[in-house]
C-alpha cells in the first residue's frame, strides 16, 4: 500500500478528527491518542449503560477493584452492578456527557475530568416525550487504567454542581 493511502483518522468525542500521516506522529504519540479515544469511549459508555439500567455492562467499565465515590464508596464490580440492579426502574434518566478532558502523565497514569447534564423523569405508562422533573449538572473526576479489554475506571468520583426542578 502506498504511503499516500495510509492514513489513520481518530475521531474524538468532541466531534473533530485528527488526521495522521506516516512520519507525522511517533508510535508513542499515536498510542497516546488511542488511549484518549478509548478512555473517552468508556466515559460515554458509562452514560449509556447507566441510562439503560445495564448493570453488567455498567460494572464492566470498572476494574475488578474499581471504586465509585459520591458521598460514600462502592468498591468492586459486583457491588457496582448491585447498585444499579437495586434501582427500581421508576425513574428514567439520560446522562449527557461533555467537556471530557483525558490526561496522561509521564508515568502513564490516566485521569479524566468531565461534566454530565442529567435529566430525570418518571417512567411513562405510554410512549411520548416526557417533561423532565429534575436535572443535575454533575462533575466527574476519574482515574483510569488500560487493561487487556480496554480502558477501565479504577476510581470514579462525582459531585453535584447544580440541581434544579421543573
Predicted regions and their residues:
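Short, surface-exposed loop/helix-turn segments at secondary-structure junctions
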Residues: 124-134
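N-terminal secretory signal peptides that target proteins for export/translocation
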Residues: 1-5
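Transmembrane beta-barrel outer-membrane domains
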Residues: 37, 91-93, 133-135
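Short, low-complexity N-terminal intrinsically disordered segments enriched in polar/charged residues
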Residues: 23-48, 52, 60-64
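Short beta-strand segments enriched in hydrophobic/aromatic residues
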Residues: 50, 62, 116-118, 157-160
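A solvent-exposed, acidic/Ser-Thr-rich amphipathic alpha-helical stretch
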Residues: 55-120
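Bacterial N-terminal signal peptides
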Residues: 8-21
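Short beta-strand edge/turn micro-motifs at domain boundaries
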Residues: 23, 109-111, 135-166
